[in-house]
């Protein structure tokens, strides 16, 4: 069987979502590890006054492509930016571009999607479902297409606790929903959305389930594969450890925790944190397309790209490693010392929200007003709480994903491909990965230099001293207000102090006797 780089040699690849987190990592990996690929057609829309070519050039000039630039300085020649709007009829392709794509494309990677959990249902259906259907219809016209690779999500069927590598029946017929949305106004769409999505937490998950069904039904005559990643995080190894460029998912929470803004989150310590590195998702997508292209299986291949069943990690462990990393390597100008409390208790959660989030933010905004600056902390806390609401479903529940197809795919790889396109998450060392992830948010999202660590540590020590001083003043105030005025309170206080003194004396005496 040919190797993965040999399979992609001379192939023309069509990629959607190349300006997104996953898409740009896939583009970099494809060009670096399969250098003899012929060309990559990238569907990109105009945005903010930038042409598709300018947007692609901006992506290619980023740090992500540093390694590729060193190894292959001429890689840009293989990338062809094509003006396309996935939300428009026929993808808004010109006749000339459409003809080129139809005649040349061998492999499609469909990575584009709206990943906003609070997206309006109409918009989510447009990009995640209708655009997928239009791409399938375009693929059916392609003369030399070998594989259609669709990137979905492991949570598409999160209404099930055990999820196999199959496409399940959709919650509603996608065609009927699309037809209904055409005559509904936005108010009606918003009103019926909660009932439509049912026990799924948001429109993103709901529409990704519909998209899988569209791929299965509309692409029945195509050679289709689906990769379902869970929570996509920073890179594990490639192109370098810890690369991340956005605040989405856990990244924003990690940063908020490192800044000392996030103090509590509704989560179960024992719930599985099914994080999967972005380079694992990319490697699996490239390998899955290779397998389907070489073997042409009869049925659609689905791969649950998850970690929980083979290398389990829990949210309590995530919290520990994130906080310990940011205490050793603090973010600049932290608001408070990093410390996060996980709780699944509703009342306790809202208590900590009031005491640890809203009260300090309110007091800090008063301080900003008094010093002539614009208050901002309450706005930050409000945005943080909205993000927490969307994520708490995933931090409070656990699922079991079948990974038989993933194991089969791993066994099909030759020794060299197993190294180059590593998908074996059993090798993932979580403590090291989380540390690199946190450092990645510092370096690549916040653009903080590691040379600034001494100053950041000094600032963290200053915050510690402020906290100690505040606690001391608080104890004195409590003493003056409550204990000093009550004989019973004083007696209890003296008893506790005496007990502590006796315990310490006993401890010192025991230590002396041992030596």
Swiss-Prot record:
Compartmental location: Peroxisome membrane
Membrane topology (UniProt): Single-pass membrane protein
Residues on Peroxisomal side: 484-515
GO molecular-function terms, A-Z: alcohol-forming long-chain fatty acyl-CoA reductase activity; alcohol-forming very long-chain fatty acyl-CoA reductase activity; oxidoreductase activity
Induction info: Down-regulated by ether lipids/plasmalogen that induce its degradation (at protein level).
Keyword hit for Hydrolase: no
Record protein name field: Fatty acyl-CoA reductase 1
Species in which this protein is naturally found: Homo sapiens (Human)
Gene for this chain: FAR1
């Amino acid at each position: 069987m040919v190797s993965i780089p040999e399979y992609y040699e001379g192939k023309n690849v069509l990629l959607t979502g190349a300006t997104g987190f996953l898409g740009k990592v896939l583009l970099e990996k494809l060009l670096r590890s399969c250098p003899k690929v012929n060309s990559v057609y990238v569907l990109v829309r105009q945005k903010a006054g930038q042409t598709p070519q300018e947007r692609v050039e901006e992506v290619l000039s980023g740090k992500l492509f540093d390694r590729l630039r060193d190894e292959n300085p001429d890689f840009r020649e293989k990338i062809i930016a094509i003006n396309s709007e996935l939300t428009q009829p026929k993808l808004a392709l010109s006749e000339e571009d459409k003809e080129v794509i139809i005649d040349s494309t061998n492999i499609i990677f469909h990575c584009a999607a709206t990943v906003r959990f609070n997206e309006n249902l109409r918009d989510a259906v447009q990009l995640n479902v209708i655009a997928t259907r239009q791409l399938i219809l375009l693929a059916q016209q392609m003369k030399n297409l070998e594989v259609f690779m669709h990137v979905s999500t492991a949570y598409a069927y999160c209404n099930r606790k055990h999820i196999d590598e199959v496409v399940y029946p959709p919650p509603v017929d996608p065609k009927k929903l699309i037809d209904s949305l055409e005559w509904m106004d936005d108010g009606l769409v918003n009103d019926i959305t909660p009932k439509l999505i049912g026990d799924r937490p948001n429109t993103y998950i709901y529409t990704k389930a519909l998209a899988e069904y569209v791929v299965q039904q509309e692409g029945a005559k195509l050679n289709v594969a689906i990769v379902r990643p869970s929570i996509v995080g920073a890179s594990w190894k490639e192109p370098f450890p810890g690369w991340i460029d956005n605040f989405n998912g856990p990244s924003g929470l990690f940063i908020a925790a490192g800044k000392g803004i996030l103090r509590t989150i509704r989560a179960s310590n024992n719930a599985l944190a099914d994080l999967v590195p972005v380079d694992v998702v990319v490697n699996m997508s490239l390998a899955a397309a290779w397998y389907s292209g070489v073997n042409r299986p009869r049925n659609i291949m689905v791969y649950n790209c998850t970690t929980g069943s083979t290398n389990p990690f829990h949210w309590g462990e995530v919290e520990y490693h994130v906080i310990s990393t940011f205490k050793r390597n603090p973010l600049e100008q932290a608001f408070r010392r990093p410390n996060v409390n996980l709780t699944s208790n509703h009342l306790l959660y809202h208590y900590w929200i009031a005491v640890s989030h809203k009260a300090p933010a309110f007091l800090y905004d008063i301080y900003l007003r008094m010093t002539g600056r614009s208050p901002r902390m309450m706005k930050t806390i409000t945005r943080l709480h909205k993000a927490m609401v969307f994520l708490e479903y995933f931090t409070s529940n656990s699922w079991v994903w079948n990974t038989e197809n993933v194991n089969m795919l791993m066994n099909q790889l030759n020794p060299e491909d197993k190294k180059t396109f590593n998908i074996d998450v059993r090798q993932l060392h979580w403590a090291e990965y989380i540390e690199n992830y946190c450092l990645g948010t510092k370096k690549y999202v916040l653009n903080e230099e590691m040379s600034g660590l001494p100053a950041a540590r000094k600032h963290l020590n200053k915050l510690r001293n402020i906290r100690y001083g505040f606690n001391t003043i608080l104890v004195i105030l409590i003493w003056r207000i409550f204990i000093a005025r009550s004989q019973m309170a004083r007696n209890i206080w003296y008893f506790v102090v005496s007990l502590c003194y006796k315990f310490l004396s006993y401890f010192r005496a025991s230590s002396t006797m041992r030596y």
